[in-house]
């Protein structure tokens, strides 16, 4: 079982939430996503994915290249118990659920295209965390992704969860891992929200055609929370 003691350098925001540092709380984060996310937020939920479900293995954390993923064990030497424990925690970490955001404040046309997104949600780490209903959650771990030239098999749980290769560095990712209080056989797709987190919404300049008035009425969004795309002028009529 993964616990807060596996991340001794992390900041304890609450008894169930740890983050890489307290400075992250005020960090602005953005997420390119589908319009369905707005429907979900209105209904008090937020979609998450299990870590093991990502098709790209490099999205899992440390990518275990078969040519490099080994440990030197002397003949007749037993694998240290601590190493076995860490390996077990790393294995169990694939059952964690994830929510991936970017800390970039700059709207990016390539991100719009890569995610085929309808909307961009902008909020802060604190606003998002404070909106989550923690009743059925055992632990949330949040940190910035660190980017490195290569990814090697690690005995460090933090590196396993928050390291990626440099090819992904333009994402400037902040990731939330969620450990639910459910049985391993339970199917989970959503975080439950105890309140709607404060955010601003931008609609894709590449595909979104609804008028601003339609958007405000449909999702009960205050007009001041809808912002225009800077990529194409008058992206919202």
Task: Please annotate each region the language model reported.
Residues 1-237:
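Partner-binding and oligomerization surfaces adjacent to conserved cores of proteins
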């Amino acid at each position: 079982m993964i616990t807060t003691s596996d991340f001794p350098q992390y900041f304890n925001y609450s008894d169930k939430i740890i983050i890489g540092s307290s400075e992250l709380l005020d960090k602005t984060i953005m997420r390119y996503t589908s319009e369905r996310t707005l429907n979900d937020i209105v209904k008090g939920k937020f979609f998450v994915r299990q870590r093991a479900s990502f098709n790209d293995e490099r999205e899992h954390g440390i990518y275990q290249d078969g040519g490099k993923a080994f440990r030197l064990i002397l003949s007749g030497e037993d694998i240290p118990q601590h190493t076995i424990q860490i390996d077990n925690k790393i294995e169990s970490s694939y059952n964690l659920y994830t929510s991936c955001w970017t800390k970039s404040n700059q709207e990016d046309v390539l991100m719009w295209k890569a995610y085929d997104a309808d909307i961009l949600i902008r909020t802060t780490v604190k606003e998002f965390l404070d909106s989550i209903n923690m009743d059925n959650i055992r632990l949330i771990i949040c940190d910035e992704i660190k980017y490195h030239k290569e990814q090697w098999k690690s005995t460090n749980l933090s590196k396993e969860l928050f390291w990626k290769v440099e090819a992904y560095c333009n994402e400037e990712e902040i990731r939330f891992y969620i450990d639910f209080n459910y049985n391993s056989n339970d199917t989970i797709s959503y975080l439950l929200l105890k309140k709607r987190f404060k955010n601003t919404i931008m609609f894709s300049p590449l595909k979104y055609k609804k008028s601003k008035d339609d958007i405000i009425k449909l999702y009960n969004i205050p007009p001041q929370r809808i912002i225009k795309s800077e990529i194409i002028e008058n992206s919202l009529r």
